[in-house]
Amino acid sequence: MADEAQAPPAEGAPPAEGEAPPPAEGAEGAVEGGEAAPPAEPAEPIKHSYTLFYFNVKALAEPLRYLFAYGNQEYEDVRVTRDEWPALKPTMPMGQMPVLEVDGKRVHQSISMARFLAKTVGLCGATPWEDLQIDIVVDTINDFRLKIAVVSYEPEDEIKEKKLVTLNAEVIPFYLEKLEQTVKDNDGHLALGKLTWADVYFAGITDYMNYMVKRDLLEPYPALRGVVDAVNALEPIKAWIEKRPVTEV
């Protein structure tokens, strides 16, 4: 008796027990003969060209330099002199610095640049909510810096003296007490209970704030001091601090 013809399995039906499923059409790694092709080599990470433009001071650019150091990222640290600045100013996006050039494209806004670099070195949050926690702290630190700067750069001595009273008696204690408690609530960090770019930003900007008020702001705040000390002790940042140009600001 002739063998009974067997109907082909319906489209999409599972293979019979012990039968290997055929590779999907166009499936990666499928080759004639059923042998899998070796996995593709991982793509080389894209390397970008970075140039940072600022004056020969720490100030607003130092958090960016800290982030470059943390990520062992090569960049050109262009330190513009006061004499060079008038000719260079019209070439900058908003006629100010710091400016970061990425693959030939110039961008401004130091906080935005720091956030961008933090993403490239793995110091951001894992979710939008975590990123929000970091952003809140960084924006608070920047608000504090701006309140100090308004007083520090006041040109009228009499007005400046009055502003200093409020700054020292109210503004500085308010912000630093809040930030001190934030660190205590986050296991020695400014956000998420771990190292993030909020810690690095704060450590990088502290010298500038101390310069503006002409004293060590963190002396009465051991938790905040601990954040700065821990960041400055990280090997790549420690190496940067040891080799960076010595500047007043």
Swiss-Prot record:
Database matches in Pfam families: GST_C_3 (PF14497), GST_N (PF02798)
Annotated GO biological process: glutathione metabolic process
Domain named GST C-terminal: residues: 127-249
Substrates-to-products reaction catalysed: RX + glutathione = an S-substituted glutathione + a halide anion + H(+)
CC terms in the record's Gene Ontology section: cytoplasm
EC numbers for this chain: 2.5.1.18
Keyword terms, alphabetized: Detoxification, Transferase
Protein name stated in the entry: Glutathione S-transferase S1
Lineage: Eukaryota, Metazoa, Ecdysozoa, Arthropoda, Hexapoda
Gene: GstS1
